[in-house]
Amino acid sequence: MYEYIKGEYMGINKDYIIIENNGIGYKIFTSGATMSSMPCCGEKIKIYIEQIVREDFIGLYGFESLEELDMFKLLLSINGVGAKAALSLLSISRLNNLKYAIITGDEKHLCRGTGIGKKIAGRIILELKDKLKSDELLNCIDEFDDVTQDNSLALSEALSALISLGYTEKEAEKVLKDVDKSESVENIIKSALVKLMG
C-alpha cells in the first residue's frame, strides 16, 4: 500500500519514529541504524515503508534506504523471524556487517539479535546465503567490524533515555557523537550525562 513517506521528522521513541505529513503523524517502527541517522526535529526526511497487517495488528515499518528495507523483507521470509527480531538484526550492526555474517555463516553474530537462537540463526544462514549475491561479499569485507564497534541500537536507546530526562534531541545527539560506542547502554548514558552536566 505504501512505497515511502516523505514528511517532517517529529521525534523518536524506543522502537519507532514519528513523521508528520499533511497534518497526520505516522508511527513508523524502525531499526537502530535508521534511528541513529535521523536529522533534527522538523527537518524533511524520506522513509521507505513496508506495511504489516495481521488480525490483531497493523503497523508501518520504515527504513532510510531501499537496501535496508529489502533486507528486512528477506528476514521476514524466514520461518520464526518476526518483525521485532528482524529489526533487532538490522540494529546490532551496519547492514553490510549483517550480510557478511550471513554469507560467511557467522551464527554467533546473528545470535546477538533479540529472539534469535542458534536454530533460527542457522536457518537464516541456510535460506539467505544463496539469495545474497556472492559479489556482495567483497563489498562487505572492507566494512565489516565487530558489532561492539558500531552499537547503533545502544546509541538509539541512550538517545531516548536522555530525551526522557529532559534534554533536547539536539543536545543528546551532540554528546553521543563523542562517547565510546563500544560501551553498554548504561555506560554510554553515564558518559553522556557527565558531558551534559560538565
Swiss-Prot record:
Residues 144-154 are annotated as: Flexible linker. Residues 1-64 are annotated as: Domain I. Keywords: Cytoplasm, DNA damage, DNA recombination, DNA repair, DNA-binding. Gene3D superfamilies: 5' to 3' exonuclease, C-terminal subdomain, DNA helicase RuvA subunit, C-terminal domain, Nucleic acid-binding proteins. It is found in: Cytoplasm. Residues 154-198 are annotated as: Domain III. Residues 65-143 are annotated as: Domain II. The keyword DNA damage applies. Pfam families: HHH_5, RuvA_C, RuvA_N. Its main location: cytoplasm. The keyword Calcium does not apply. One of its GO terms (cellular component) is Holliday junction helicase complex. One of its GO terms (molecular function) is four-way junction helicase activity. GO terms for biological process: DNA recombination; DNA repair. Homotetramer. Forms an RuvA(8)-RuvB(12)-Holliday junction (HJ) complex. HJ DNA is sandwiched between 2 RuvA tetramers; dsDNA enters through RuvA and exits via RuvB. An RuvB hexamer assembles on each DNA strand where it exits the tetramer. Each RuvB hexamer is contacted by two RuvA subunits (via domain III) on 2 adjacent RuvB subunits; this complex drives branch migration. In the full resolvosome a probable DNA-RuvA(4)-RuvB(12)-RuvC(2) complex forms which resolves the HJ. The RuvA-RuvB-RuvC complex processes Holliday junction (HJ) DNA during genetic recombination and DNA repair, while the RuvA-RuvB complex plays an important role in the rescue of blocked DNA replication forks via replication fork reversal (RFR). RuvA specifically binds to HJ cruciform DNA, conferring on it an open structure. The RuvB hexamer acts as an ATP-dependent pump, pulling dsDNA into and through the RuvAB complex. HJ branch migration allows RuvC to scan DNA until it finds its consensus sequence, where it cleaves and resolves the cruciform DNA. Belongs to the RuvA family. Has three domains with a flexible linker between the domains II and III and assumes an 'L' shape. Domain III is highly mobile and contacts RuvB. This is Holliday junction branch migration complex subunit RuvA. It comes from Clostridium botulinum (strain Alaska E43 / Type E3).
